[in-house]
Amino acid sequence: MLDINYIEQNLDEVIQILNKRNQQDYSEDLKYAVEKNLKRKQILVKSEALKSRKNQLSKEIGILIKDKKNEQADKAKAEVVSLNEQIIKLDEELRIVNDQILEKLSYIPNLSHKDIYFGKSDEDNVEIRKTKHNPLLTHSTPHWEIATKLGLVDFEKGVKLSGSRFLIYTGLGSKLVRAIADILLKRHEKHGYKEIFCPLIVNKSAMLGTGQLPKFSEDMYQVGEQYLIPTSEVPLTNLHANEILTYDMLPLKYTSFTQCFRQEAGSAGRDTKGMIRLHQFNKVELVKITHPDQSMNELESLVKDAEDVLNMFDLPYRVVELCSGDIGFSSAKTYDLEVWFPEQNKYREISSCSNCTDFQARNIQTRFKDKDGKIKLVHTLNGSGVAIDRLIATILENYWDGEKLVLPTILKPYFDNKEFLK
């Protein structure tokens, strides 16, 4: 979440920046939070004054008793009892006000970086670079038909077992998922990421920490008081919650291959066929915990690491910078990698790389001690490296020649050096 003290000191600027996000007006929410923060400070001043008086009286009582001034000691004791009651009352008022501030701030997004483009929707995103359109062969067969024809995926059994937007990888399809995950993890390890095998269920505090809750609760799968992860960004970012790191530990770089779970609320009627939008999907995630001064440089290298994956599979793609109206809730700056789908004749997102600055770190209290011994918040970054189901889908469409799937060179060792699948 945002720093309430920064909001208070820069209210007009914060309102101006935030109101560029989806053209939404956050001014009333921000003013409410500032008003409650002023009340919080007033309560603290009163409480500290009462505690100071209580401490003074406690010392005096000991002296009065020692001097056998019992009547005065009794009066002082009575005042201490009264002070305790007032302090308890103020503590409860403080708790309520703190909850009100946190509740309001939890729905307010991060401040977008000053250099990002202004826009209203994904149509206003800016293309940064792209590779040449050079698919192996041209055709117009959708990936789900290819997957079914080759026996890689059983969509009907997925629906039978779990409902819409679920699928089953079978035989070589299952092997393909494992092969790609292995390729990606090895590549990211080469780039300095530490592999983590993390839980698929996390506590509510972890989801609050990364900003999935409370705003996106309808998109989450809940298991009792816990949640299935929508991305391994959640457990990876929370690895150092409530810790103080040293500056020489930074940057920390983590990668993880997991299943991810999303309700896809609001996606009715979109991508109902195929492997693009699933309730359970496979993804390799990249997370960085960095020094604030280096986070923008680390974002650029994060994008390069994700691009490297697409280059390994020789797939046509482009990099776009998200505009102010399309950027994610926790992000200050985001690049999307979009891969080419010949059958759809358009680019589709396969990776989103974001710098969340100190927005998540403030929630989870991940800090570091700098060279001068000062305690500061880290910056957190995350990106898909990449979404495996979408990667398989685009491989199917770009490497299908109408009769067989020509294997990308990097996959051949996993399939006994075969040239194709049919």
From Swiss-Prot:
The encoding gene: serS
Residues holding ATP: R262, Q263, E264, E349, I350, S351, S352
Annotated domain remarks: Consists of two distinct domains, a catalytic core and a N-terminal extension that is involved in tRNA binding.
An example Gene Ontology CC term for this record: cytoplasm
Entry EC number(s): 6.1.1.11
PROSITE patterns membership: AA_TRNA_LIGASE_II
This protein's UniProt keywords: Aminoacyl-tRNA synthetase, ATP-binding, Cytoplasm, Ligase, Nucleotide-binding, Protein biosynthesis
Pfam families noted in UniProt: Seryl_tRNA_N, tRNA-synt_2b
Record's subunit section: Homodimer. The tRNA molecule binds across the dimer.
GO biological process: selenocysteine biosynthetic process; seryl-tRNA aminoacylation
First-level EC class: ligase
Protein name: Serine--tRNA ligase
Role, per record: Catalyzes the attachment of serine to tRNA(Ser). Is also able to aminoacylate tRNA(Sec) with serine, to form the misacylated tRNA L-seryl-tRNA(Sec), which will be further converted into selenocysteinyl-tRNA(Sec).
Record-listed L-serine binding positions: T231, S232, E233, E285, S384
Species of the source: Mycoplasma mycoides subsp. mycoides SC (strain CCUG 32753 / NCTC 10114 / PG1)
Covalent S-S links between cysteines: none
Stated family: Belongs to the class-II aminoacyl-tRNA synthetase family. Type-1 seryl-tRNA synthetase subfamily.
